[in-house]
Amino acid sequence: TDRFPGIFHGSLWEVGKCSSSSFEIYIPPVEYYTTGTLILDGSMGYIGIVDRPIEIKIENGYITYIEDTEDGRKLKEYLESFDDLEMYCAAEFGIGLNTISKCRGASYIEDESAFGTFHIGFGRNLALGGSHNARGHFDLVTHNPTIIVDDKVIMKDGHAKAIQPIEWGVL
């Protein structure tokens, strides 16, 4: 495909430029192909922290099922508020790289940056190198995930196979 991973590193290299404070590696998936089950146990973007894990099913790139729990209903209500079915489309896969950040539900940027987390974004991904347009973008963060892509383990219990944490102050 023509999809390439990107990295948000929170660093500014040029005067007058702006950067996200996020520290993550991400890739926009090919639209309409993502299929699987997400057990959401971290945070729901602007909604906040998840009180108990929610099962979410994705088929052919779109959310098809959200477990009927209090948090599940909040998520459904939030997505429905966009009045845009394209907000249900998988748009980003990301892995947090910041060993200082924590997933607390107070700031979605910090949540998705926390080392050992995985997030899946839904909706628009044009700025990430994808081709999907929607009325917004929304990330769901999960703790200590196991990620399997094409029968290859990318991350096991929050430990990425190719990414190791940097101990700050050692550099």
Q: Could you tell me what each predicted segment is?
A:
Residues E86-N144:
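Cysteine/selenocysteine-centered motifs that mediate thiol-based redox chemistry or coordinate metal-sulfur cofactors
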Residues R52-I66, T146-I147:
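Active-site and channel-lining beta-strand-loop segments
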Residues T37-I39, E55-K57, Y65, G94, ...:
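Structured core elements
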Residues T1-R52, E59, K74, D84, ...:
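Active-site bordering "gate/hinge" segments
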Residues L126-L171:
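Long, Lys/Arg- and hydrophobic-enriched amphipathic alpha-helices
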Residues S43-G45, Y62-I63, E70-D71, N98-S101, ...:
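Short, glycine-/Ser/Thr-/acidic-enriched flexible segments
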Residues I54-K57, R73, E80-D84, I109-D111, ...:
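Short, solvent-exposed amphipathic alpha-helical segments in soluble enzyme
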Residues Y62-G96, K102:
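C-terminal, non-catalytic macromolecule-binding modules
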